[in-house]
Amino acid sequence: MKKSLFLTLTLLLPLAAPAAAQQATVRLTIKDHQFQPSQPRAPANQPLTIIVRNLDSTAAEFESKTLRVEKVVAPGGEITMLIRPLNPGRYHFFDDFHQDTTDGDLTVE
């Protein structure tokens, strides 16, 4: 049984590597209550990872109604979100705690 499992995994592993390479990553930083970059881009129809690092001394809440995500980022902390494949378009995001200064748009093409 162990040999057949090992053989199966050995044969399937090369197929998994190209699929993992297809995932795009967007990295955002919050500093002085501003997203950097505030206008990131990502490829359409692929899973997406968004990483948000908060360099401010206060908490932030990354939120996007169009992306269907909402997560608190502690001061000096970092969060990672896995996003479903997206259609081309613009997806607005903001810091719910500082909406007047902290927002941006993800362009998917």
Where are these regions (language model features)?
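N-terminal signal peptide c-region/cleavage motif recognized by signal peptidases
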Residues: 14-18
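Structural beta-strand segments of beta-rich domains
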Residues: 38, 46-50
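Bacterial N-terminal signal peptides that target proteins for export
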Residues: 1-7
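Short beta-strand/loop motifs in extracellular/secreted proteins, especially
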Residues: 48, 58-60, 102-104
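Asparagine-centered strand-capping/turn motif at beta-strand->loop junctions
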Residues: 52-54
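Beta-strand-rich interaction surfaces with strong enrichment in secreted/lumenal proteins
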Residues: 38-40, 68-72
